[in-house]
Swiss-Prot record:
Record GO biological process: 'de novo' pyrimidine nucleobase biosynthetic process; 'de novo' UMP biosynthetic process; glutamine metabolic process; L-arginine biosynthetic process
Catalytic reaction annotation: hydrogencarbonate + L-glutamine + 2 ATP + H2O = carbamoyl phosphate + L-glutamate + 2 ADP + phosphate + 2 H(+)
Binding site for L-glutamine: 45, 213, 215, 243, 246, 282, 284-285
UniProt name for this protein: Carbamoyl phosphate synthase small chain
EC number: 6.3.5.5
Pathway annotation: Amino-acid biosynthesis; L-arginine biosynthesis; carbamoyl phosphate from bicarbonate: step 1/1; Pyrimidine metabolism; UMP biosynthesis via de novo pathway; (S)-dihydroorotate from bicarbonate: step 1/3
Boundaries of every Glutamine amidotransferase type-1 domain copy: 168-345
Species of provenance: Thermoplasma volcanium (strain ATCC 51530 / DSM 4299 / JCM 9571 / NBRC 15438 / GSS1)
């Protein structure tokens, strides 16, 4: 089955289709992670995006369904050089091709991903389709104009998770992955809500945590969350990861911007001026450091200087993923820092 990758600049690439027969549309981005492909594909921050794996070989070890970061694959499509689509090992008994068919996600293999990564780095992310017939006329709307957070997290009633000794955290889920499990391991009690919840009606918590998520943090659909965070500056301790850092920064009055091709992968170096860490990233937006006034930037990306760690009075947030999944555990100290700042360390 032949499939085609059609980009907004007119480039058309052909390859071997696998997974679902469906066609797909999204923002074409790449990840530099060499392993952890299942965790990557199931990260809700990828909603609205088609993913290129910079690593040429994918799915060369068996699927472990317990390592999924959400309830399913979140990328719109995946583009690979050499996917082992029929690999079936051990007791898992799942082929990659079969799994993607069940998830309704198309893949296209045999693509020169090295060339494609260079193209994205040079030109920025590209709106693209994976199609079965490239002869049709196609429109290329901006996926970031959509309310991607609602696609990642449907509205639900608040969920209470009882911990043992770590205090109670209001967990604003904007597309969380493994962070929820990490906070449970820290013995926090959690009140889990989504962005459509009336946050002002929730009571009985000691701190507020804002999760990662997809899309543009300044999207109008998130205005109620930003307003709520703004009203709680200096009232409750605020914490955030990735998208959460951006949302908190907006609440303080800072600005965010869209990056040329973003940071995605489990091998990004971050420095605080004293220590350096290897971290996992998945974001296409960042905080404009020149607009920061009422909090401090205390960590930066070692390659391009992107804002990575911020702190203020009763506020602490990171742009990277200390829970990794996939990736290194250099920054798991973040969760201990949360407990210390809340007063339960």
């Amino acid at each position: 089955m032949k499939k085609y990758l059609v980009m907004e600049d007119g480039t058309v690439l052909s390859g071997q289709g696998y997974g679902s027969y469906k066609e797909a549309y999204g923002e074409l981005v790449f990840t530099t992670s060499m392993t952890g492909y299942l965790e990557t594909l199931t990260d809700p921050s990828y909603v609205g995006q088609m993913l290129v794996f910079a690593s040429p070989t994918i799915a060369n070890y068996a699927l472990e369904m317990g390592k999924m970061e959400s309830n399913g694959v979140k990328v719109s499509a995946l583009i690979t050089k050499d996917a082992h689509i029929e690999l079936k090992k051990g007791g898992y008994g799942r082929e990659f091709d079969e799994f993607l068919k069940e998830q309704g996600i198309p893949g296209i293999d045999g693509i020169d991903t090295r060339m494609l990564v260079r193209k994205i780095r040079a030109n920025g992310v590209l709106r693209s389709y994976v199609v079965n017939d490239p002869s049709h006329s196609l429109d290329f709307p901006d996926p970031m104009n959509d309310d991607l957070v609602s696609k990642a997290v449907p509205h639900h009633d608040p969920v209470f998770v009882k911990g043992e000794e770590g205090g109670t955290v209001l967990f604003i889920d904007l597309g969380s992955k493994n962070t929820l499990k990490e906070l449970m391991l820290q013995n926090f009690s959690l009140i889990v809500v989504d962005k459509q919840t009336n946050l002002d009606e929730i009571e009985g918590y000691d701190a507020i945590f804002v999760s990662n998520g997809p899309g543009d943090p300044s999207h109008p659909s998130l205005s109620n969350v930003i307003k709520f965070l703004s009203h709680n500056i200096g009232v409750k301790p605020l914490f955030g990861i990735c998208f959460g850092l951006q949302a908190i920064s907006l609440a303080y009055g800072a600005k965010t911007y869209k990056m040329k091709f973003g940071h995605r992968g489990s091998n990004h170096a971050v420095t605080d001026g004293t220590h350096s860490y290897v971290t996992t990233h998945n974001h296409g937006y960042a905080v404009d450091g020149s607009t920061v006034k009422d909090f401090k930037v205390i960590g930066w990306d070692a390659n391009d200087g992107t804002v990575e760690i911020i702190e203020g009075d009763d506020m602490f947030a990171v742009q990277f993923h200390p829970e990794a999944s996939p990736g290194p555990h250099d920054t798991r100290w973040f969760f201990g820092e949360m407990k210390r700042r809340i007063g339960y360390a």
